Amino acid sequence: MQYSSRFLELNIPDSFLNINKIPDATKFITVTYICLTATLFCIRRSLYNKLVLEDPNLDYNLITSPLLQMVPSQIWRYPTSLVLSNFIDTKAWKVVVNLLNLIIGGSFIERNWNSSKEMFKFIIVLGSLTNVLIIMLTLLVSFFSNKVRLDIPLDGNYTILIGFPIIYRQLLPETTIIHLKTPQFLAKNFRFKLLPIFVMFTMTVTQIIWFHHFAQLFSIWVTFFASWSYLRFFQKLAPLNCPSLPTTNSQGGQEILVGDASDTFQLIYFFPDLIKPILRPIFNFIYNVVVVKFKVIKPFHDIDIDIGNTIAESRGAKKIMTVEERRRQLALQVLEERMVNP
């Protein structure tokens, strides 16, 4: 789909908008999301209508259903909320965004992965494990700060809103979404590779300035790092799009690729150049501790990185060059120009 005006150009790949047949996992997750979100709305509205008669000043936002919503103080009585909260939302804007994300983005992702199992794992399993970690962090921080309230529900459904942009960046790295034409000083191509940090920046600023809900801020960033970590190190996919690639793992006689070892999918490249010098030593330290020292995660071999780079380049990602490689390329260009024009 393309749209052009004097102010901007909008370009979305046709494959991204192909929803003629919604894949099985995406269909199941979408239907479950609609049903549970509608159920939660009915439960809260019914409770509110009863309680408001006793207290006319009752705030509707304080009405909760701990069976579905992830309330830290009630989690021991209702552990089902760790899973069910992946399928609910209470804010209208988030319902609309997540439905579009699921129907359009989920269909695109599942077709590219060619695996309903991986879609279920990413949304439900990873989402639930992330919720467990978020609850643990929230309870821990509550011992040191009275600003963290344990009676307010945490949003357990950030995997779609935050995780999907990471996948879009992985599958469509250099594809331009919007090209601003005017004003000239703002003229810029907004590509899918910028979408994750744009979403994270927007949601972080919103929580800090307007909502002041710091437990939700934990949830946002934990979901971001958990989603990236799974895609980077643990996801298992058959290399259907690149059948000629060598693979180093097999499962049930089928060759598989584990994770995304490409240079462009390194965590540091998700962040702006301005803060990379600050973040690089921090990320390197964490990598050395987790991977090199304690071997919690299996490190990538050279062949894994080569395969990852080949797949990333086939998707349109630009090759990451070191300073030495850039200097060598520049020197070759200068030499060629001198040979052509002595």
Swiss-Prot record:
The miscellaneous remark of the record is: Present with 1630 molecules/cell in log phase SD medium.
- Origin superkingdom: Eukaryota
Q: Does the keyword Transmembrane helix apply?
A: yes
Please list the residue ranges that the record places on the Lumenal side of the membrane: 43-121, 181-207
Q: Which UniProt keywords apply?
A: Glycoprotein, Golgi apparatus, Membrane, Transmembrane, Transmembrane helix
Q: According to its record, how does it sit in the membrane?
A: Multi-pass membrane protein
Identify the main location.
Golgi
Residues bearing attached sugar chains per UniProt: 114
Cellular component annotations (GO), alphabetically ordered: COPI-coated vesicle; Golgi apparatus; Golgi membrane
Family statement drawn from the similarity comment of this UniProt entry: Belongs to the TMEM115 family.
Pfam families per the UniProt record, alphabetical: DUF1751
From the UniProt record, give one GO term of the biological process aspect.
retrograde vesicle-mediated transport, Golgi to endoplasmic reticulum
Topological domain (Cytoplasmic) residues are: 1-21, 143-159, 229-342
Species in which this protein is naturally found? Saccharomyces cerevisiae (strain ATCC 204508 / S288c)
Give the transmembrane ranges: 22-42, 122-142, 160-180, 208-228
- What is the protein name stated in its UniProt record? Transmembrane protein 115 homolog
List localization entries. Golgi apparatus membrane
Query: What's the subunit arrangement here?
Result: Homooligomer.
PANTHER family, alphabetized: PLACENTAL PROTEIN 6, TRANSMEMBRANE PROTEIN 115
Q: What does this protein do?
A: May play a role in retrograde transport of proteins from the Golgi to the endoplasmic reticulum.
